[in-house]
Amino acid sequence: MVSLRDNIESQPLSHNRRIRKNFGHINLVADIPNLIEIQKNSYEKNFLQLNIKDSERKNKGLQSILNSIFPISDSSNIANLEFVKYEFDTPKYDVDECSQRSLSYAAPLKVTLRLSIWDIDEDTGTREIKGIKEQEVYMGDIPLMTKNGTFIINGTERVVVSQMHRSPGVFFYHDEGKVHSSGKLLYSARVIPYRGSWLDFEFDAKDIIYFRIDRKRKLYATTLLRAIGMSTEEIIKFYYNSVTYKFVKNKGWSVKFIPQHITAHRLTSDLVDADTGNVLLKAGQKITPRLAQKYFGVGLNNILVTHETLIGKYLSEDLRDPASDEVLAKIGEMITSDMLKVINDLKIKNVNVLVINPQSGSYIRNTLFADKNQDREAALCDIFRVLRPGEPANIEAAESLFYNLFFDAERYDLSEVGRIKMNSRLELNISEEVTVLTIDDIKNIVRILVELKDGKGIIDDIDHLGNRRVRSVGELIENQFRIGLVRMEKSVIERMSAGDVDTVMPHDLVNSKILVSVVKEFFSTSQLSQFMDQTNPLSEITHKRRLSALGPGGLSRDRAGFEVRDVHPTHYGRICPIETPEGQNIGLINSMATYARINKHGFIESPYRRVKNGYVTDEVVYLSAIEEGKYKIGQANSKVDQDGKLQGEFINCRVEGGNFVMVEPDEVDFIDVTPMQVVSVAASLIPFLENDDANRALMGSNMQRQAVPLIKTEAPFVGTGVEGVVAKDSGASVLALHDGIVERVDSNRIVIRTLEQKVDGSPSVDIYNLLKFQKSNHNTCINQKPLVKVGHYVKKNDIIADGPSTDNGEIALGRNVLVAFLPWNGYNFEDSILISERIVKEDVFTSIHIEEFEVIARDTRLGPEEITRDIPNVSEEALRHLDEVGIIYVGAEVKAGDILVGKVTPKSESPITPEEKLLRAIFGEKAFDVKDSSLHVPSGVSGTVVEVRIFSRRGVEKDQRAIAIEKQQIEKLAKDRDDELEIIEHFVFSWLEKLLVGHVIINGPKQITAGQTITTEMLKGLSKGQLWQITVEDANVMNEIEQIKIHYDEKKYALDKRFTTKVEKLQSGDDLPQGALKVVKVFIATKHKLQPGDKMAGRHGNKGVISRIVPEEDMPFLEDGTVVDIVLNPLGLPSRMNIGQILETHLGWASINLAKKISTLVKEYKDNHIDIEEIKKFLLELYGKDINYILEGSEEEIISFCNKVSKGVYFATPVFDGAKVQDVKDMLELAGQDLSGQVKLIDGRTGEYFDRLVTVGHKYLLKLHHLVDNKIHSRSIGPYSLVTQQPLGGKSHFGGQRFGEMECWALQAYGAAYTLQEMLTVKSDDVNGRIKTYDSIVRGENNFESGIPESFNVMIKEFRSLCLNVKLEVTPSK
């Protein structure tokens, strides 16, 4: 067999990755999890359960909804529709086709349903199966997720953002004393289900307990307890302990001594031991719980109390006459002096009373006695009247309503999470499958609420991440599906009842449009389905990892208070404390931390390393916020010796509530995995983050997402080590799917022969078509460039092509530039930035932006619109860029106003004069009955046409241009097919030759005689077809050849079939919107060079606008003649406190000078002045042991590595574990630079040195997408507002600049009366005046007259709307 590893370069491509000098001290035991798995797991694994056999699907997501909705039965129970299984067909169009054709990337959902028809005997009521019909029913197209975790909806890429909401369960809290004027705490409890009615319990100022359902009118809590079937006696027994008072003759009453019921107070009567009669404490003396416990310990069991003590106590059972058994007082009643007299008179020996004291209040008893309802029926009717006001209350309706509210699984669902939270809070042990409320739940909620009021236990923290959970994309769409299926269920029941069930098939009953419309609505209009932020790869990743507290079922930004927005201790390692928007959404929209993941219950988990007996292990455990509270967790930078033992007498640990304690090493349970786990992806890309103020770090995180991809990408010299992970997970770069060898490479595609053999031993071929100059959602340019060469050996998941904003597999949002911190003639006042002309000349910050323009030719009432070059009243000059069809050529340079696509629209006929008739007769019909409706380049846009796409309706004849584009696409498909076939053929025929050589021929083509032994030369002259004709003696070889032939033919057939399918799809025409005959899309690329007014920023929140571009000769320069690229204001630092940028500048300075030193060493080596060992020694000193494998390689490899760092040495300084000031100094020293990081700088204008040393260094700067070209605009002519007749405002309306109230004051202050009058009349809304002014300008005159502005007429109209008839009387001037 042919070796698959022929001609492989010895090193895999992964060895070409960039090596960074890493300053981190902590060894990583856990890799950063895939950054977009939150999206993919939620939708594909948990919701759709794609690629899982039907029998192996778990009851979750789509499967669980279908199981819960089906079976559906009709009202008479004759027909029954059951769910069997579901599956997805392959999507009609792939991702790229959907993007181009403005379609949704979706797969048809096919659900197998079984319709059972029953025969019911009317006499006996017995049922028999009459017939069963099983059928696969189409339930609509369900959007699929792309490999990057996005959805394509109507051709645009969208992201469904995860939502943070309050977890289902029960929560206890108080009003913080805000409601009642006395500041009294009013406690309340709320049961929040996943789906269903909310149930609230609350205290009022008089300590009566109420409940509400869905925030409606409140009722007494005991009404609810009665409604669930509790009697007065059961209520009192459940919530109170009782104690018995026994009558002791001539002494009073004896009662059991319970020290727990004693609070510190002064005795009003003596404390007497009932058993011995001893006085233990005199009246007036103080008793404390501790003293009470002491007496109890020495045998005090019962004490004597006076008769009066019983007054004010509450009975714990009915008080009965011993003789007649007549009820004298009911349970719960208060003992009064009259009742005590009756007790004494009737010689009742034992009286049972409730234990009500400061530790156990009388709230339930008081509520019972305030409540008028005495039985279950009355309570249910009372609840019914509140929920259904106006409807007559009967017991059946009331019972049914109450049951449906909380105990019916179809209408009420706590969810598994809700049940777990409920069980843990109420200390119950109810099965997790019970997702409705139970009687025990309600009883215990009231019990805990009362205990809180009594000062036992603590309230819940709503902002604790154990009480907030994440609803990811799968769950959000699951909820929409449920809504759609419930609506569909109603229509199925109606159809069952309406028609003849015997003749109906399942597909007749199901109307899939209901389901499809709900799903479509969610993806198109939901607040959580958002247009993807595609400015650069980082903004994509951040958008997919975003957590929003807004949206349906969440908070609204107007009502969200400070607490919800604030950072909470449980955010540690779960939600980034830095990255959140500035403005009204601050704290409501967050980003997940780098290492965080979401568990099956929707709670965010963070990883920790387990510590056993003071030794740190490599076992990584993910803990949620609830679990984390049980442990003591040390920091990642805790000192550890070589064996992993924690060093030091005490370790600083985090415990529940966000507090820190010092504990011994043996008591530590876990330590953090890495300090980076605290922050999000964007924040982890900021080097020296630990030296920046948090507010500026927030701006830095947010502005990195606005960086525009540049033409020339460059990774930062000073990075954090995360750059590669971001580039890989974002999907911007192209990853190898399998191990393989690169066969062909050009700028458009990469062809790789894989090393993973099929069953037949043949290789498969991977073809990667690269994206070239595609438009992103934010009009930035998506372009991929290959990194591999022919013959390279690549491993699976190696990066083989760079995408936008990536450089050699690392994210590269900006450029490394030489900056100096220096004031320069006031041009860097207020954060302005001064740049050198070199930056513009060499396209350092030049970016390409692509705009899309679309024109649709429709079928109108008067006839079809036509795309044509033949446009009335348009000069040949204006048509110079159009082809014969009327569509612009690719490559044409266009500016505002140019025609992109010529189009004419029929216009309605109007009566014509004899002269027009004559003209028509001479010049033909065309020009008169159509009007020009061509697509022009809008104002402010210019550039090069890079692509034209034409879509024609099915059945409409294609024009020449469309056929030419189609031909190009077919040629591309054919090339892919031919290349793949060629690689397979090369392999198959090499293998065939190897099998045949050395064997004796029995039969073969004419030029070969039988009986010969086959040689390689003999086979060279044969065609591929003739090779198959050869037969040899060895039967095993012939069997193998036959197998190869079968597999080869199958492969060839599959390739041809795939090719013909794609060609048919191209030629068949397109699905266009209603009434559209043809759609033409034109893409214009614009090069934006850096210019004054553009916004730039660093990674530390240091932003500014370019104020001036200075010629290179005027810029400050170094002593060696190097000109500084950018001059920044030193005053931008002290008050902003983002010192990280200075450390970055110093390390960047070291990077450049180390690179110079390495280049010098290489030059000296090439000139034979030094040995390779000198270079090795220097590299070892710089990088340490990280590059041993390179130093052990050949001299060529070492020199090749040195050449890669000739522009700058790459550093990684991980956040919170990076380079310290001393490390920066060490690098500067190694580079032979002053440790201050400052140099002598020469002024380019005078040639003299500046007075003092200046901080200079390489810094990473970004160009943000706030470009001056898209902001600045001025109005010449344009539209006016209809009512006020004033010019409109804003760039999109081609509006003017408003001369507002304050500007009027300015003119008034200067007394510029005529200027003011002109501004308020002819330059604004004096309609006649401005027409006359225009006329006078045309005539060359300078005079104008002001009339009445339209706003005056508007004011008069408003007076009249107030019934004040104001008239303007104009007196003629004399």
From Swiss-Prot:
InterPro entries: DNA-dir_RNA_pol_bsu_ext_1_sf, DNA-dir_RNA_pol_bsu_external_1, DNA-dir_RNA_pol_su2, DNA-dir_RNAP_su2_dom, DNA-dir_RNAP_su2_hyb_sf, RNA_pol_bsu_bac, RNA_pol_bsu_CS, RNA_pol_bsu_protrusion. One of its GO terms (molecular function) is DNA binding. Its EC number is 2.7.7.6. Changing L310F: In strain: Breinl. PROSITE patterns: RNA_POL_BETA. Changing R195I: In strain: Breinl. Changing K282N: In strain: Breinl. One of its GO terms (cellular component) is DNA-directed RNA polymerase complex. It catalyses: RNA(n) + a ribonucleoside 5'-triphosphate = RNA(n+1) + diphosphate. One of its GO terms (biological process) is response to antibiotic. Pfam families: RNA_pol_Rpb2_1, RNA_pol_Rpb2_2, RNA_pol_Rpb2_3, RNA_pol_Rpb2_45, RNA_pol_Rpb2_6, RNA_pol_Rpb2_7. Gene3D superfamilies: 2.40.50.100, 2.40.50.150, 3.90.1100.10, DNA-directed RNA polymerase, beta subunit, external 1 domain, DNA-directed RNA polymerase, subunit 2, domain 6, RNA polymerase alpha subunit dimerisation domain, RNA polymerase Rpb2, domain 2. Keywords: Antibiotic resistance, DNA-directed RNA polymerase, Nucleotidyltransferase, Transcription, Transferase. Belongs to the RNA polymerase beta chain family. DNA-dependent RNA polymerase catalyzes the transcription of DNA into RNA using the four ribonucleoside triphosphates as substrates. The RNAP catalytic core consists of 2 alpha, 1 beta, 1 beta' and 1 omega subunit. When a sigma factor is associated with the core the holoenzyme is formed, which can initiate transcription. This is DNA-directed RNA polymerase subunit beta. It comes from Rickettsia prowazekii (strain Madrid E). The lineage of its organism: Bacteria, Pseudomonadati, Pseudomonadota, Alphaproteobacteria, Rickettsiales.
